[in-house]
Amino acid sequence: LLAQSDCESLSIRELLALEPGAQEDFLDTWLGYSENDGAPALREAVSGLYAQCGPENVLLHVGAQEAIFGALNVLVEPGEHVICQFPTYQSLYEVARAAGCELSLWPLHQGEDGWYCDLDELERLITSKTRLLVLNTPNNPTGYALSADERQRICELARRHGLRILADEVYRGLEAPDAVPPAFCDIYERAFSVGVLSKAYGLPGLRVGWIASQERDAIGALSRYKNYLSICCPTPSEALARIALKHGPAVLARNREIIARNRRIAADFFARYDHVFLHNPPQAGPIAFHGLRPDFVARFGSALAFCEHLAQSAGVLLLPGNVYDMDAPYVRMGYGRANFAENLAVLDGWLQQNG
């Protein structure tokens, strides 16, 4: 597997070992219903990730997917206009479309030095019906990360036009420790930040996500909507999530080290196969969206056909760009797993024979 979007995971035993006495405490976890908004202690821990959002500004969810689904059904009405960054996690625009919203996609562009965004292009997409701007940074699948200046300019644009912002920030924390940008919910009073333990922390089995905003009334509306979804998070997951967040800096540091090591390995690989790939190293996070050179992809007909052939002939899985509704020949590669070098070596061997 070379297509993963998350980071190296931990076992329950490894997670409990981070906290003395945690195993006995975990075995005493009550298996009744949790609170609809989430366990107070866990909401307190999540709020510690933000500067302007206390526990009352945080709503826990079963994963980020539920938070996205709720937000796009509560924050906008059918017929209103939503602008979504593209390419991105499909739910961020497909749920808006399914909810009856008009949709415009704000594309990232391929440049000589990787991906970039055009803020003037974003402003041209805004209409009198626009109500919500949906962002994903660091971005899945490109690894593009909005700069601090771009974030401020987007917030100023949203404020000027009276827009809300829904920011999928599930990879936040994988930037360099001295360069982690403020969350959108901290720098814009009408922004909603989505987080999760699945991606940056590498704990998707816990199924714990959240949404945070300074708009407490909207958080209340999202809480009421959640009553028709999961109702509450599993109490064992909440107990383990508290440990993960308490030791979050160590978990994130480990994952950043894995990504950095794999980036160095990948840089050498792509230098040797420049005739096959357009190398787009991730600016932040564990995933990148690499291009396929025209002469190479022409041998297969499409990125999808190449990925299918690669999976069947070499047992290597890359994710083709058509999964993200991209016609251009791109493949997603994940840098977050400890066995990256081993898996990349299999692709290397195949390319030596077929590249």
Give each language-model segment a name:
Residues 189-260, 264-269, 354:
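Conserved core segment of the aminotransferase class I/II
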Residues 52, 123-124, 299, 309-318, ...:
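PLP-dependent enzyme catalytic core of the Aspartate aminotransferase-like
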Residues 1, 242, 258-267, 279-295, ...:
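Conserved glycine-rich beta-strand-loop-beta hairpin in the small C-terminal domain of fold type I
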Residues 80, 101, 160-163, 189:
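A short helix->loop->beta-strand "cap" motif at the edges of active sites that frequently abuts
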Residues 99, 160-161, 273, 314, ...:
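Helix C-cap/helix->beta junction micro-motif
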Residues 110-179:
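Active-site phosphate-binding strand-loop segment of PLP-dependent enzymes
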Residues 1-63, 70, 245-247, 354:
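N-terminal small-domain helix-loop-helix segment of the aminotransferase-like
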Residues 74-96:
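Conserved PLP-anchoring active-site segment centered on the Schiff-base-forming lysine
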